[in-house]
Amino acid sequence: MASTNSQDMVCGSVTFRDVAVDFSQEEWACLDATQKVLYRNIMLETYSNLVAVVGSCISKPDLIVLLEQEKEPWMAVNEETGRPSPDLEADYDAENISPQNRIYNRKFSKQSIKQLSRTFDPKGSWFSNGPNYSTFHGLRDCQSDAGQQITNKEGVPPHTCQTLAHNTEKPYECKECGKCFGCRSTLTQHQSVHTGEKPYECKECGKAFRLPQQLTRHQKCHSGEKPFSHNEGRQAFQHPNLLKYPKAIHTGAKAFACRECGKSFNRVSSLVEHGLIHADVKPYECNECGKAFKRHRSFVRHQKIHSGERPFQCKDCGKGFIVLAHLTRHQSSHSEEKPFECEECGKKFRTARHLVKHQRIHSGEKPFECNVCGSAFRLQLYLSEHQKTHMEEKYLECNVCGKAFRLQVYLSEHLKTHTEENPFKCKLCGSAFPNKYQLNKHLTVHTDGKPYQCKECGKCFRQRSKLTEHESIHTGKKPFQCEECGKFFRLNTLLIHHQKSHSGERPFECKECGKAFLLPSQLNSHKIVHTSKRPFECKVCGKSFKRESNLIQHGAVHAGVKSYECSECGKGFIHRSSLFHHRKIHSDEKPFKCQECGKAFVVLAYLIQHQSIHTGEKPFECELCGSAFRCRSQLNKHLRIHTDVKLFQCVED
């Protein structure tokens, strides 16, 4: 729940009027059905976000009441004067008031236009980056220095409300997603989103774009054209939308400060959105899994995970994505184009973002600092991993059975087992479950548990995502590249694990010997070394092992199966690692060199074993007779003397 301080942060200084936009009846009539629904959703979300931060110290505006009742918002008028509520500063022409239907000839003042622009500004509003922003973007075209006039539909000039007055009929429907459009050309442009087609190519650098206006805007980067100038700072900009942001530099307009952390903002809407971070309020909860979100757009994006909807598909590998931006980022992995080159070392990158991260290696810049201990890191990823070392585990305990959980979501799901609240029933066997996620998980029992089969090798999986990961083994594609060393990986999780090796951070330490590890799984695997237990015994020779994986590897020795064959000489090997080491013999690659005598080895383990000759160290001792040996293989051969084990029998007597 939000603290009192976080509520006081904006209470008394921020009102709903600061971030709202109103429409009169004639303005409302100019919007089509889609824009009306969009406006209603935006205003309701704006109010809910404001309440989440401020709390109960603001009253519900009449506009919100009308929108919740799905009534027309222009009905919120002052009955005494017959004029709209004075929420936006506007000048009215009294002679043009129609007493019959209260339609006004409304002339927007500069202040009202600024209010409209500020609320729907691309950088100032928390809903501006969502999928609906481009639909509403046409409202900003009505801005003017002198003001613009919007009259009723009978007396409006053809050009005045051109961006607002759209035909309510939308006969052209997209077959992919069902979205409708008023013009065929608009539909054609939209369809390129699904096809991924980019017919407009830049002759300078070869970069392709979906729309001609995107190409035109991009070409200004090469020409250096900046037609929109700012007088006060004598700065020039390539796009008119960028013109208004530097004005805040000269006016000192960062008037809205957060009382929690002191961060300042140019707009109230940005402050309200930032306040949600301190408030820790997540009003949007998923009915499927119980996960909660602070923002509506994050909630909508999350729901596509459960529905399986991935409308944006890659033409090269067939992989689907929920968001277009993810597809665009993924497509760069297929192209070998790397236009961004480091001036220091000449290394090239696909995106400017990756180049900036790489340049921090040369500059030594570490902008991400830990608030607890002051340690600095080059990447946000390294800081996030480091901060986990300071976090204490906080468990939420069930009052009924005492079971503990890390997250409130998991505890809430668990409590349903005690209340017997299981609304989701299986139609095949009648079993009931507290949520749809567990029901879907149960349904795999009826489909032999693994409904997703690989067409290449026939292997089955319980989840589609696991099948997709597995299929990358057959394709051989490794789209995820490490920025530090250039190594490629099949999966993003493998890349993340690998990147930790560059940071040098090993937060998981063994309490027995002090050895540190990158991952908790590596620490758990290491702990077996300190135990004397060897629970996994070979039924053929009686040899015991600490790990089951070692027993499986050992079993291949008795089976005599050598499934890994060298393509150079035809020699077979039981283990893949043995084949990998053997291949270095053909390549004459011996990277591990002894500093004492200069002898080189294919494998690091061979070098370590060789170095014991110079040191005279014999760490492997026989427990029965006390004999010591340089390597474990010599000890194993010696132990057969005491056990009298004779593994190899002559077939011909």
Swiss-Prot record:
Compartments (UniProt record): Nucleus
GO molecular function: DNA binding; zinc ion binding
Record-linked InterPro entries: KRAB, KRAB_dom_sf, Znf_C2H2_sf, Znf_C2H2_type
GO terms, biological process: regulation of DNA-templated transcription
Entry comment describing in which tissues the protein is expressed: Expressed predominantly in the testis (at protein level).
UniProt name for this protein: Zinc finger protein 59
CDD domains to which the protein is assigned, alphabetical: KRAB_A-box
Protein family: Belongs to the krueppel C2H2-type zinc-finger protein family.
ZnF start-end (C2H2-type): 172-194, 200-222, 256-278, 284-306, 312-334, 340-362, 368-390, 396-418, 424-446, 452-474, 480-502, 508-530, 536-558, 564-586, 592-614, 620-642
Highest taxon in the source lineage: Eukaryota
Residue stretches making up the KRAB domain: 14-86
Keyword Chaperone: no
Species name: Mus musculus (Mouse)
Its biological purpose: May have a role during differentiation processes.
GO cellular component, one term: male germ cell nucleus
Keyword Thylakoid: no
Keywords on record: DNA-binding, Metal-binding, Nucleus, Repeat, Zinc, Zinc-finger
